[in-house]
Amino acid sequence: MSQNQKTIAENRKARHEYELYDRFEAGLVLQGTEIKSIRRGKVQLKDSYISFQKGEAFIKGMHISPYEFGNRFNHDETRDRKLLMHKQEIQKLGQSARVKGYTVVPVRIYLYKGLAKLEIALAKGKNLHDKRESQKAKDAQREIQKALKNQY
C-alpha cells in the first residue's frame, strides 16, 4: 500500500467466504454527500456485489450512511453505483463472472489522492471444508509466529 492510499473499509467476509483471484481497481461515480460520508468512514461493503449490465459494471448493496450535515438533498444509502474501469477489464470480468461458481466481489474501499477507489476481485466460493482448512492453516501460522517470538 503506497503513502497516498488510506483504507476506509474492508470486506473481511469476502476473504472468508471466497477464494480471491485477480484483483482490479475501479473508480466510483458518487454524489457530493456520498464522498463526504466515505471520508468519514461511514461505508459498509458487507453484503455488496458487482453486477454487469450493457457493458457497464455496477456495485449493488454497498451502504453509505447519510452525511450528518447534509440537507434534504442527501443521497440514497443503498443505490446502485457505477464503477469506472477500462472497457477491456469490464469485458474480462463479465466473461469470468458468467462461468459457474465465479463471481466478482468488492474487497476494500480506499482513498487515493483524494479520490474514492474500490478494489474488486474475481472470486470463487469456498465450501465448508475449504473454510475449515484455511482456518487451520491460519492458526498454525499464528502458533509458529508466537513460538518464534518467544524464542528471541
Range-by-range predicted roles:
Residues 48-52, 109:
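A structural signal for short hydrophobic beta-strand segments in well-ordered beta-sheet cores
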